[in-house]
Amino acid sequence: MEFIRAEILGTTFETTSRYANVQPVGLGAFGLVCSAYDQITQQHVAVKKMMNPFANASIAKRTYREVKLLKQLRHENLIGLCDIFISPLEDIYLVTELLGTDLGRLLRARPLDNKFAQYFMYQILRGLKYIHSAGVIHRDLKPSNLLVNENCDLKICDFGLARVQEPQMTGYVSTRYYRAPEIMLTWQRYGKMVDIWSAGCILAEMLRGKPLFPGKDHIHQFFLITEVLGNPPPEVVQKITSGNTQRVVNSLPNQEPRPLRAVFHEFDNDVISLLEQLLLFDPDKRLTAETALQHPYLAPYHDPDDEPAALEKFDWSFNDADLPIDTWKLMMCVAIGSAKCAPN
């Protein structure tokens, strides 16, 4: 396999000769992303260099998890993996579909017309139905992780934080504005409904053109939520596992909930109704992705015969393993060796 090496944004970028016209798109904490032209498929693609994938055992596990998720999760509303390889410098490169922009960039320009918000929300929930049916929680759903092309096709990306639903889970995940209250309150026990809360926040932001709960820190974030929803009900407070957090919540001044109709007076009744069933303190009372797809607001797009669930659960057996870096590297090589370019 022949590799071509270039310096891009101060980073060595190595690709196989299959990929031409490599141009930088963005640089983040976990990787450099470039656009390129795939000379075999004759399609434009995104090539992501994963930075220091084996820097330590924790990062190696995160890298392995993201690769496994991209390989197994195949759906029209999830970013599709086309190729994967390890370069001569032992960096990992992921090749995925290339979409022109993301929802975050669109929202920085202006609010969306209702018809676009409707279509994007349908696709978000369609993707979440599939993810959740595979036993996966995204945990970091936000506008910048929702890629969009010129046809308004939407694809969920960035599965670096995705996890299995477990009894105990870490508290600091997801970008603050879209973070479900149970993450802030209980810190450890939560499930797939954190993604549903995030989707509700994104729907409100699409129509308003600005975040619904733009907290400066997690305490301010929680305060902004109570300004709309009121104090958390007793059944939610009882689920808080931290005694300190429970005392703080119980000491809050009484805050009556505001009707969402008063908060979003410019929205139509159907979207208010959907938001009321997504943005609930109690995750057990929120609509699932599958039931939300049946809501009247999404009726123009809902098709139960074209909203597939995963055929099998994702295998999380590796997730609790405490393995040395060399073992993760070997497992990664095995995974990459069996990677195929498969259509969604």
UniProtKB/Swiss-Prot annotation:
Modified residues (Phosphothreonine): 170
Residue positions, PTM Phosphotyrosine: 172
Cofactor(s) named in the record: Mg(2+)
Gene Ontology molecular function: ATP binding; MAP kinase activity; protein serine kinase activity
Motif interval(s): TXY: 170-172
EC numbers on record: 2.7.11.24
Ligand binding (ATP): 25-33, 48
Top-level taxon: Eukaryota
Activity-regulation annotation: Activated by tyrosine and threonine phosphorylation.
Pfam families linked to this entry: Pkinase
S-S bonds: none
Record's keyword terms, sorted: ATP-binding, Kinase, Nucleotide-binding, Phosphoprotein, Serine/threonine-protein kinase, Transferase
InterPro entries: Kinase-like_dom_sf, MAP_kinase, MAP_kinase_CS, Prot_kinase_dom, Protein_kinase_ATP_BS, Ser/Thr_kinase_AS
Reactions the enzyme catalyzes: L-seryl-[protein] + ATP = O-phospho-L-seryl-[protein] + ADP + H(+); L-threonyl-[protein] + ATP = O-phospho-L-threonyl-[protein] + ADP + H(+)
Active site: 140
PTM entry text: Dually phosphorylated on Thr-170 and Tyr-172, which activates the enzyme.
Domain Protein kinase: 19-298
Role, per record: Mitogen-activated protein kinase required for growth on media where sorbitol or mannitol is the sole carbon source.
Domain remark from Swiss-Prot or TrEMBL: The TXY motif contains the threonine and tyrosine residues whose phosphorylation activates the MAP kinases.
Similarity-based family: Belongs to the protein kinase superfamily. Ser/Thr protein kinase family. MAP kinase subfamily. HOG1 sub-subfamily.
Protein name, as recorded: Mitogen-activated protein kinase mpkC
Organism expressing this protein natively: Aspergillus oryzae (strain ATCC 42149 / RIB 40)
Lineage start: Eukaryota, Fungi, Dikarya, Ascomycota, Pezizomycotina
